[in-house]
């Protein structure tokens, strides 16, 4: 029997969803008998849950969970505290590489650090949690921009104020478009002293359950610490770390999907 509730209709709807999640697709009769819901009430709830896309009918006329639940779970996962999810993974990456690590996000066309992980052995870089980032001069900024929807990306690029901070800074939209295309192809970005001449950075994207960009991580060092040979090694480590965080958010790689 259902427990008493001040909102019995809501309780019964949740019980229906939990029942189908537990035993799989089932008929209206099974739902009514198992939960002890009056027939008229059950059909009202089932029809409303279908209308709201929480439920659907399969080819055998059994009720099954449907797309609205997937959408809601994706939103919930994407809003989980990224900092606490990422902190142990970034700490491990810092321990492995001996370099400073960041987690950054893009919001309303601007990028920010939301987590900085360092030790006494890492270099001192002018960064802090909450610091805004250049979207065209930093590795993590370019990474965040590379995976924006095309229209959003173009709008952001059109609004950029270009400043040549170092000899390697990108200073033209066409250069940036080419760089972003290269980043998407290789799966990671690189700051070749484009914001600070002596600083190098490798960054990789973090995705959610809907395969949408959620954040990016970066590994930062001096030009002596991150040479071309070590850069490629760091890229592999950064990608692996970013994928670990992505999986915690419900993301699945093509290999995960093939195995499931």
From Swiss-Prot:
- List residues annotated as DNA-binding: 28-47
| Domain called HTH iclR-type: residue spans | 7-67
* Source organism superkingdom: Bacteria
Keyword annotations for this protein, in alphabetical order, are: DNA-binding, Transcription, Transcription regulation
UniProt KW Transcription keyword: yes
What's a Gene Ontology MF term here?
A: DNA-binding transcription factor activity
Q: State what protein this is by name.
A: Uncharacterized HTH-type transcriptional regulator RhmR
Q: Which organism is it from?
A: Escherichia coli (strain K12)
